[in-house]
């Protein structure tokens, strides 16, 4: 009976606690991007630049009012 109680406590308490990913363990860039996912595309592009994600530009967008290469 004691073995069953130990197994139940491990399964019901310790296992779920071990599988939880704490917020402090997640990379800061991931948390930052997750918080900004509902922004419009222009704001999202600016946050990607802030996170260090490099974007390449097509040659057809070299016109000054182009927003994808700004």
UniProtKB/Swiss-Prot annotation:
Residues 21-55 form a propeptide. It is found in: Secreted. It holds the Pfam family Conotoxin. Expressed by the venom duct. Its main location: secreted. InterPro entries: Conotoxin. It comes from the Eukaryota. The keyword Secreted applies. GO terms for molecular function: ion channel inhibitor activity; toxin activity. Belongs to the conotoxin M superfamily. The cysteine framework is III (CC-C-C-CC). Classified in the M-1 branch, since 1 residue stands between the fourth and the fifth cysteine residues. This is Conotoxin ba3a. It comes from Conus bayani (Bayan's cone).
């Amino acid at each position: 009976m004691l073995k069953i109680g130990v197994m139940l406590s491990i399964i019901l308490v310790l296992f779920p606690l071990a599988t939880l990913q704490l917020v402090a363990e997640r990379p800061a860039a991931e948390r930052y991007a997750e918080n900004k996912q509902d922004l419009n595309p222009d704001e999202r592009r600016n946050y990607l630049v802030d996170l260090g994600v490099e974007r390449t530009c097509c040659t057809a967008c070299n016109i000054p009012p182009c927003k994808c290469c700004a």
